[in-house]
């Protein structure tokens, strides 16, 4: 991978644990935190995909809020406005994975420009990064807001090429979401899939270039390959 000149990371589920909202959900709905988090994330993604197909873009905060309303209705849980806001805000305070900071620090030390490309709005990306004290880490924070469509639309991945300033074949795309990794590969990025759950990759034509178990393994592999 000596031709890699920069790296772009997915945010939700790759650098940050989306299920770190379980605690906030559990505080409001004891015994339901895990079920809420999992269905909430599932519907959040479904709404981004469906809105892209329908040409009805809203920002990620709105998609997340709508997914939470569905989740609570489906699970038979009462959701007042105050609780809705409290839980939605939890998505702005996600916890980085334990290996995120060290992996990013090692890649920066190797001289690689780093970026995030996310379905999140500019505001939400900046808040997640700031709230976790990771402002030092990234050269580019890239939002789908600039093209008004969500991943896996190819226009999103094109943003990374433009903002990072390198040809797509020289930008490593890193994601733990198999559908995202496949779409990025289809666009033309070399792709590293973070397979934390030891799962099967989606049966789509485009496959990742490299598969690892976590960000620590990814940074070790890449830095060693650059030597």
Curated annotation (Swiss-Prot):
Sequence positions that bind an (S)-2-haloacid: 11-12, 41, 118-119
Active site, per annotation: 10 (nucleophile)
pH dependence: Optimum pH is between 10 and 11.
Annotated site, Important for catalytic activity, chain positions: 14, 151, 157
EC number(s) stated in the UniProt entry for this protein: 3.8.1.2
Domain of life assignment: Bacteria
CDD domains the record matches: HAD_L2-DEX
Region (Important for catalytic activity), start-end ranges: 175-180
Gene Ontology MF annotations: (S)-2-haloacid dehalogenase activity
Reactions listed under catalytic activity: an (S)-2-haloacid + H2O = a (2R)-2-hydroxycarboxylate + a halide anion + H(+); (S)-2-chloropropanoate + H2O = (R)-lactate + chloride + H(+)
Keyword flag Ribonucleoprotein: no
Reported biotechnological use: (S)-2-haloacid dehalogenases may be used for the biodegradation of halogenated substances and their derivatives which are widely used as pesticides, herbicides and other industrial products.
Gene3D superfamilies noted in UniProt: HAD superfamily/HAD-like, Putative phosphatase, domain 2
Keyword list, A-Z: Hydrolase
Record-linked PANTHER family: HALOACID DEHALOGENASE, TYPE II (AFU_ORTHOLOGUE AFUA_2G07750)-RELATED, HYDROLASE, HALOACID DELAHOGENASE-RELATED
Subunit structure: Homotetramer.
UniProt record similarity statement: Belongs to the HAD-like hydrolase superfamily. S-2-haloalkanoic acid dehalogenase family.
Function: Catalyzes the hydrolytic dehalogenation of small (S)-2-haloalkanoic acids to yield the corresponding (R)-2-hydroxyalkanoic acids. Active with 2-halogenated carboxylic acids and converts only the S-isomer (or L-isomer) of 2-chloropropionic acid with inversion of configuration to produce R-lactate (or D-isomer).
Protein name listed in UniProt: (S)-2-haloacid dehalogenase
């Amino acid at each position: 991978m000596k031709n890699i000149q920069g790296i772009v990371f997915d945010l939700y589920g790759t650098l940050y644990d989306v299920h770190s909202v379980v605690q906030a959900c559990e505080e409001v709905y004891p015994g339901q935190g895990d079920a809420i988090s999992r269905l909430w994330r599932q519907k959040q993604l479904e709404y981004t995909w469906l809105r892209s197909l329908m040409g009805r873009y809203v920002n990620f905060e709105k998609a997340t809020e709508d997914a939470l309303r569905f989740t609570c209705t489906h699970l038979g849980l009462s959701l007042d406005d105050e609780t809705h806001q409290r839980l939605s805000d939890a998505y702005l305070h996600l916890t980085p994975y334990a290996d995120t900071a060290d992996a990013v620090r090692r890649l920066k030390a190797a001289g690689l420009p780093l970026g995030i490309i996310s379905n999140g709005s500019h505001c939400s990306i900046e808040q997640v990064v700031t709230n976790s004290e990771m402002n030092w880490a990234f050269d580019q924070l890239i939002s789908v807001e600039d093209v008004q469509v969500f991943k896996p639309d190819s226009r999103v991945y094109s943003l990374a090429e433009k903002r990072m300033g390198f040809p797509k074949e020289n930008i490593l795309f890193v994601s733990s979401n198999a559908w995202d990794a496949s779409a990025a590969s289809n666009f033309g990025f070399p792709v590293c899939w973070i397979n934390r759950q030891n799962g099967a990759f989606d049966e789509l034509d485009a496959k990742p270039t490299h598969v690892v178990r976590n960000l620590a393994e990814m940074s070790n592999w890449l830095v060693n390959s650059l030597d």
